[in-house]
């Protein structure tokens, strides 16, 4: 199942590499790659990515669409 998200767009706007986002979020670069391709991930992983991109949890819809 594909999940719509703006992770790649936001990451590129912030001039971040996948490796840098992965390091800030505490996940692997492979995980970032899978998420950017639209693969499903755990809620905790989404939380880490939202915070690493500089958003608050209340702004989660700007990063991940349900």
For each feature predicted by the language model, list its residue ranges:
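Short amphipathic helical patch at the helix-1/turn junction of helix-turn-helix
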Residues: 1, 12-13, 40
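Short basic helix-loop element that most often maps to the first helix and adjoining turn
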Residues: 5-24, 48
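Key DNA-contact positions within bacterial/archaeal DNA-binding proteins
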Residues: 19, 29-33, 58
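Recognition helix of helix-turn-helix/homeodomain-like DNA-binding domains
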Residues: 27-41
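DNA major-groove recognition helix of helix-turn-helix/homeodomain DNA-binding modules
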Residues: 44-61
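A short, Lys/Arg-enriched interface patch at domain edges and termini
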Residues: 63-66
